[in-house]
């Protein structure tokens, strides 16, 4: 469960290292997001020479959560960290590489480019 003020690790090479969630997209009353949801976030840490800079406001899709997500068969998938991938307006990733595994739930949300770049899909 990702909510406002949650800090996320960045799982791509866009130049950002850490994000602070400003808003979970999908309605004015929406409080929390899970894997596959889009958030608006501010870049809190960035590497020098990256595409995004510290202080930039970006959109990102959640790819890993500690709290986990329930699947159709009743099983749950949990990860060791909360992570996101920075995306453009057309839902394509801003970076060219994805680090770490991503959840299978991203296939249903038009994020096939992220799934194809990921080294492992769980």
Curated annotation (Swiss-Prot):
Keywords: Ribonucleoprotein, Ribosomal protein, RNA-binding, rRNA-binding. InterPro entries: Ribosomal_uL14 (IPR000218), Ribosomal_uL14_bac-type (IPR005745), Ribosomal_uL14_CS (IPR019972), Ribosomal_uL14_sf (IPR036853). One of its GO terms (molecular function) is structural constituent of ribosome. GO terms for cellular component: cytosolic large ribosomal subunit. One of its GO terms (biological process) is translation. Gene3D superfamilies: Ribosomal protein L14. The keyword Ligase does not apply. Belongs to the universal ribosomal protein uL14 family. Part of the 50S ribosomal subunit. Forms a cluster with proteins L3 and L19. In the 70S ribosome, L14 and L19 interact and together make contacts with the 16S rRNA in bridges B5 and B8. HAMAP family: Ribosomal_uL14 (MF_01367). Binds to 23S rRNA. Forms part of two intersubunit bridges in the 70S ribosome. This is Large ribosomal subunit protein uL14.
